[in-house]
UniProtKB/Swiss-Prot annotation:
Subcellular location: Cytoplasm, Cytosol; Cytoplasm; Rough endoplasmic reticulum
Gene3D superfamilies registered for this protein in UniProt: 3.30.1230.20
Keywords: Cytoplasm, Endoplasmic reticulum, Ribonucleoprotein, Ribosomal protein
GO molecular function, one term: structural constituent of ribosome
Assembly notes: Component of the 40S small ribosomal subunit.
A GO cellular-component term linked to this record: rough endoplasmic reticulum
Designated name of the protein: Small ribosomal subunit protein eS21
UniProt-listed InterPro entries: Ribosomal_eS21, Ribosomal_eS21_CS, Ribosomal_eS21_sf
GO terms classed as biological process: translation
One Pfam family, short name: Ribosomal_S21e
PROSITE patterns: RIBOSOMAL_S21E (PS00996)
Family named by the database record: Belongs to the eukaryotic ribosomal protein eS21 family.
């Protein structure tokens, strides 16, 4: 689809679940998106970079969202390995 300026734009850009790689459809109102900012240890201020985690409603419905977030943050080095 094109806008008035002639640029190609998408109406809907689907997201994927970070834990299961499922596509999150538009009507999945139980899904959550968490953005964790990187913090400078010297100043305590948020840096320009961040890490985003998306959990679909099916994972949340099973009660596995907290385990998935812990597993993903350990893999990315945000949490320590022996948490």
């Amino acid at each position: 689809m094109q806008n008035d300026a002639g640029e190609f734009v998408d109406l809907y850009c689907p997201r994927k679940c970070s834990a299961s790689n499922r596509l999150i459809h538009a009507k999945d109102h139980a899904s959550v998106q968490l953005v964790i900012a990187d913090v400078d240890p010297a100043t305590g201020r948020a840096a320009d970079s961040s890490k985003m985690y998306v959990v679909c409603g099916a994972i949340r419905r099973m009660g596995e969202s907290d385990d998935c977030i812990v597993r993903l943050t350990k893999k990315d080095g945000i949490l320590v390995k022996n948490y």
